[in-house]
Amino acid sequence: MRRFISLLALCGGLLAAVCTTAPSTVSAREPGQEIIRCGQQTPIKGSPRFFTGTVRIDPLYAANNAMRSSGGSVTFEPGSRSHWHIHPVGQVLIVTAGVGLTQEWGKPIQEIRAGDVVICPAKVKHWHGAAPGSAMTHISICEETEPGKVVEWLEPVTDSQYAGR
């Protein structure tokens, strides 16, 4: 229970940091914090080339010269899911709401819930999405190997695979 509360506090802290931080004074000569205000970035509809069902991606931050990671909040409606994919450097998912499912190729489906953190190592084929009866939102953090390259998309997860058959 303490672990769950700690993880939930971490998730809330990440969202609060992204959405409510005070302004910074960044000059061209001095490195400093960059503040990206909650709601500044336009949500993206998940493409059917990469997702099954209704998925919304809310970009949180992009990789830049000082940092190779990028992050986004991804919301899956019930039954929606990613296609199979791999990350060249790995991925961290922080589930912030709902109930979801994730699976590594050749292994059983795992249920994930708000407060759970999923650490997917580099080059592990997997998928993730909402459970059949619940929406699910997670924060995804990935690292680029080259500009814009954080994922290699593969084939869709079939309905039979999603059902665990």
Model-assigned labels for residue ranges:
Residues 24-68, 150-165:
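A short, N-terminal "cap"/entry segment at the start of jelly-roll beta-barrel domains
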Residues 68, 86-87, 106, 130-132:
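Short glycine/proline-enriched turns and hinge-like loops at secondary-structure junctions
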Residues 59-61, 75, 103, 111, ...:
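Generic structural detector for well-ordered beta-strands
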Residues 56-57, 70-87:
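Conserved short histidine dyad/triad with adjacent acidic residue
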Residues 101, 108-109, 113-114, 122-150:
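Ligand-binding loop in jelly-roll beta-barrel domains
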Residues 8-22:
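Bacterial N-terminal signal peptides
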Residues 1-4:
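Positively charged n-region of N-terminal signal peptides that target proteins for export
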Residues 81, 86-114, 124:
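A short beta-strand-loop-beta hairpin characteristic of the jelly-roll/cupin
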